[in-house]
Every structure is written in structure tokens, then in C-alpha cells.
């Protein structure tokens, strides 16, 4: 298979595939006599794993580690599960941070009259001001 075939099958761009190769995240493809990359089912599996790992929140390094585990016949599912649960905990922390930000923004928006006056509790709060501007 050539790179355009692999791109269609995996849903990745040719540029992304080359990037993953440059970063050493996938097994290097063989080269044909004319210098074109030749891909196998193994490459499809690795690239699909990378794409899907990225979609569920794993960063590049973590995704590469998952590819390494995929290629390791001696891997332990406990390692994969541990990494997955660590990612879940990280996502949960991020959700809590986002919810806190959302609540803070809603409180600011509720404190703002949203009228034609220059007084804006949102700006005052975010700028650290504690007094209204003198008129």
C-alpha cells in the first residue's frame, strides 16, 4: 500500500503519517525501488491506534508508548489499563478545572448589568480592581 491508500483507510493525512514516522511513533515503512514508502497491515494497525489514542486524549508521547505496548508480545494488560486509568484521572481533573472556570465566568456574567454604562464588574474583577471608576 502507498501513503495515500493508508491515509484513506486510517483517516489520517499523508502529512500526519509522515510526521508520526519522523517522530518514530510507528514502524518505519519499507521503501520500494522507486523510493516510495510501502505499508503493511502492521502500519495500518499502528496508525489507527495512534489516531484513536489521540482522539481519546492521549498526547503524542503517550500514544507512542501505546504503540510500543501494542508491538510488545510480552506486554501486560495491567500496564495498558494503568495508563488508561491515569488518563481518565487527568481528564477528570481537567473537567473539574473547566467546571470551576465556567462557574466563575457565570458568576461574573450574573454580576454584570449588561447595559450601556461603563461600569462592568467583569472587567473590574478580572483586572483586580476593587473600586468602581469615578464618574
UniProtKB/Swiss-Prot annotation:
UniProt: Cu(+) binding residues: 112, 120
Domain of life: Bacteria
Main location: cytoplasm
CDD domains: HTH_CueR (cd01108)
Keyword set includes DNA repair: no
Subcellular location: Cytoplasm
UniProt KW keywords: Activator, Copper, Cytoplasm, DNA-binding, Metal-binding, Transcription, Transcription regulation
GO CC terms: cytoplasm
SMART domains, sorted: HTH_MERR
Stored InterPro entries: CueR, DNA-bd_dom_put_sf, MerR-type_HTH_dom, MerR_fam
UniProt DNA-binding residue ranges: 4-23
Residue ranges annotated for the HTH merR-type domain, each copy included: 1-69
Gene Ontology MF term list: copper ion binding; DNA binding; DNA-binding transcription factor activity
Annotated SUPFAM superfamilies: Putative DNA-binding domain
Domain notes: It contains a N-terminal DNA binding region and a C-terminal metal binding region.
Protein name: HTH-type transcriptional regulator CueR
Taxonomic source organism: Escherichia coli O157:H7
Lineage of producing organism: Bacteria, Pseudomonadati, Pseudomonadota, Gammaproteobacteria, Enterobacterales
Gene responsible for this protein: cueR
Amino acid at each position: 500500500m502507498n501513503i495515500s491508500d493508508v491515509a484513506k483507510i486510517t483517516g489520517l493525512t499523508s502529512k500526519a503519517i509522515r510526521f508520526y514516522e519522523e517522530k518514530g511513533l510507528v514502524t518505519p515503512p519499507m521503501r520500494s525501488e522507486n523510493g516510495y514508502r510501502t505499508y503493511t497491515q502492521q502500519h495500518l494497525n499502528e496508525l489507527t491506534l495512534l489516531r484513536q489514542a489521540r482522539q481519546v486524549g492521549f498526547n503524542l508521547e503517550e500514544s507512542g508508548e501505546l504503540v510500543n505496548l501494542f508491538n510488545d508480545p510480552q506486554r501486560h494488560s495491567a500496564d495498558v489499563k494503568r495508563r488508561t486509568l491515569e488518563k481518565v484521572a487527568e481528564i477528570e481533573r481537567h473537567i473539574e478545572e473547566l467546571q470551576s472556570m465556567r462557574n466563575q465566568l457565570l458568576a461574573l456574567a450574573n454580576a454584570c448589568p449588561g447595559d450601556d454604562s461603563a461600569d462592568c464588574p467583569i472587567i473590574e474583577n478580572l483586572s483586580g480592581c476593587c473600586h468602581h471608576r469615578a464618574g
